[in-house]
Amino acid sequence: MRNEPLTGYLLHHKPYKESRALYYFFTQTHGVVHGVGKKGMPLFAHIQLFASGKRSLKTFTQIQPLTPQVAITGQNLYAGFYLNELLWKLLASEDAMPVLWQNYQHSLTTLREPLNGVQLRLLLRFFEQALFTELGYAITLDTDSQGEPIKQEQDYRFIADEGFVNYIAAQKSEPTEFAASSIFLGKWLQQIDDYLQTHQEQVYSLKNHDKAIQADTLKVWSGLHKLMIDHLFDYQPLQSRALWQQQARYR
């Protein structure tokens, strides 16, 4: 790159020198770009800057917001930290993902609005689903690992690299103790899939979504996604998740 204009969002920053910082900048055209620039780039703001450099670490100059910044507050702020951590830790450098970038931009817009607890969890599940798809880990909810339709009264074990494995068949071939959190009843998977089939096109409009999904279904969906996130992070703790849980205890 040679003084190339980039627009996007700051995902993360680290101290670099007295007046400079190392930035992880998420762009629509180049994915996550690593660069060094003057300290002070704000999170969650739509930003334009100029990037130069042939190596993986660029030099960022002329950093400026493109639109007035509307603050993200409360629980929504911690959700924003979580989205950022997923992206800067999981995405490869300079690998464009324009669909995921648009999803992230819309998610930030929604996080600037008042959301109840159910709407906030739904926003996160939709975003995680888009991320899994981009990373090649899309979760198939209507068939098991052998391509057979999910059965309502059947138990399945979720394995990130395989999908849903028939629990009874797996136990017969290789009896093993599994964590209860990895076992899912088919009817819950069907309910999640039915919800997605109905509401996928309305992902950016969460109004009345909280009335369209049962609390138990959302809880199961959240547990399923947590298994995938833990797998992708090799079971290392997420800083944003710990921060969110910590502040929740002191509210």
Language-model region placement:
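Non-catalytic alpha-helical scaffolds and adjoining flexible linkers that form interface surfaces
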Residues: 1-18, 26-251
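Histidine-centered divalent-metal-coordination microenvironment in nucleic-acid enzymes
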Residues: 22
